[in-house]
Amino acid sequence: AEYVVESTGVFTTMEKAGAHLKGGAKRVIISAPSADAPMFVMGVNHEKYDKSLKIVSNALCTTNCLAPLAKVIHDNFGIVEGLMTTVHAITATQKTVDGPFGKLWRDGRGAAQNIIPASTGAAKAVGKVIPELNGKLTGMAFHVPTPNVSVVDLTCRLEKPAKYDDIKRVVKAAADGPLKGILGYTEDQVVSCDFNGDSHSSTFDAGAGIALNDHFVKLVSWYDNEFGYSNRVV
């Protein structure tokens, strides 16, 4: 095979993923964060890709949702600091019923019966693809009993004052322009099922966000964490 998508979640380092190269593959895409492989998010830093790189990471589905939105907001208004929460659909690593999960007791609780707080490196990883935001974002996840589609809540402090309508305008311009196909924009009264099979990395929900004032806002963006992410891998 010329290209191998490493999606087991096991071979996520350069050394381990390199086994595919030894097996005859020409390039490897890791569908997860990596400790040492270069990380790329389409629409954010993909232009920095160098053809000499044989192994790359496509980051997390949540990073692919957050990073394009964070880039647009930071480029236009400046993000001083921010906290992200993802309300995330069930994943393959969760338990069907309560069971052992090392020291992470909550992660071992039944996926279909609980809302489960969990850690995620998705927000911090944005700093790897947008260096100016390194150390300015962190976040957490709530795993919920739905089969697919997740949603990011980015609450951030802005450097430049902005009305919520200003934010909607610049996000829509990006969605219709340079980030078309990656960042979406909707003013419809949507819910999670509406995004099953949506190929965007991130769809900004204009009607769901709120502003406390011109410097402090909560922004909401949806993503099909399976199909949408798979489109970016391809």
Swiss-Prot record:
Keywords: Apoptosis, Cytoplasm, Cytoskeleton, Glycolysis, NAD, Nucleus, Oxidoreductase, S-nitrosylation, Transferase
SUPFAM superfamilies in the cross-refs: Glyceraldehyde-3-phosphate dehydrogenase-like, C-terminal domain (SSF55347), NAD(P)-binding Rossmann-fold domains (SSF51735)
Post-translational modification: S-nitrosylation of Cys-61 leads to translocation to the nucleus.
Residues with S-nitrosocysteine modification: 61
Any Pfam family: Gp_dh_C
Chain's role: Has both glyceraldehyde-3-phosphate dehydrogenase and nitrosylase activities, thereby playing a role in glycolysis and nuclear functions, respectively. Glyceraldehyde-3-phosphate dehydrogenase is a key enzyme in glycolysis that catalyzes the first step of the pathway by converting D-glyceraldehyde 3-phosphate (G3P) into 3-phospho-D-glyceroyl phosphate. Participates in nuclear events including transcription, RNA transport, DNA replication and apoptosis.
Protein name: Glyceraldehyde-3-phosphate dehydrogenase
Lineage, highest ranks first: Eukaryota, Metazoa, Chordata, Craniata, Vertebrata
Gene from which the chain derives: GAPDH
